[in-house]
Amino acid sequence: MAEIEAIRRYWNTRAEGYSLKTAYDLQHAETIWLDRLRPFLPESGRLDVLDIGCGPGFFSSLLARLGHAVVAFDYTEGMLERALQNAAEAGVELEVSQGDAQSLPFPDASFDLIVSRNLTWNLEQPERAYAEWLRVLRPGGSLVNFDGNHYRYLYSAPYEEERHQPDYTDGHDPDFMLGVDPAPINAIAANLPLSRVDRPQWDMETLLALETDSIRAEVERRHFVNEQGQSVSIIKNFMIAARKKA
């Protein structure tokens, strides 16, 4: 995995700005995200939750506020430091663990729920990651992954066409980038496998081949007219949820 250390270094530089975005989301978008997670949460009871690629701990703090036991897991030490800070400000406690999402340091069947947001596109071995996540999930537990086709434009004409739309944004909000140059991660993304495939179709096919008995996907589409006057529809972001076989 030639790129993993370069990926870690980049996200360490992003930790401060990404933490500001997490604090903003916890203040302004908590209800939206709770509504998206609620179908996978019990009405009562405490779950053992693993937040993979937790970053500054958005999902970790959100779910800990509900009383669940959360392990915040990330490869980047700067992100874990911010996750602990954000948890303290939210008045909750987290367990943090540093490691590779493609090779988890947990025993089989350790968690009731696994959540992840904006991680899998970064991975060099995403199929291995999904297998690992299901390994540490308990039978009947849910894996819920939010991600997007962030670098699909490198290999797909419709996604490249979207970049020419007058209202296009690349997601790098200057208020949260704090002057960090995204060029390193842009270059890395060109060599990552998920930049080359259509998602969540790839994710569904991969998870169906593993220990799952139920898969659900929700997509956020972008519609526009390209420079040739043709109507185009692309999937920008998505949620995919899988239940491990009981």
PLM feature spans:
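Core SAM-dependent methyltransferase catalytic element
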Residues: 210, 227-246
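Class I SAM-dependent methyltransferase SAM/SAH-binding core
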Residues: 50-52, 56-103
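Short alpha-helix
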Residues: 194-211
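Conserved class I S-adenosyl-L-methionine
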Residues: 1-45, 58-62, 142-179, 221
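A short SAM/SAH-binding and catalytic strip from SAM-dependent methyltransferases
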Residues: 113-126
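A short glycine-rich, Lys/Arg-flanked "PGG" loop and its adjoining helix->strand segment in the class I
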Residues: 127-139
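A short acidic, Gly/Pro-enriched loop at the edge of an enzyme's catalytic core
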Residues: 102-113
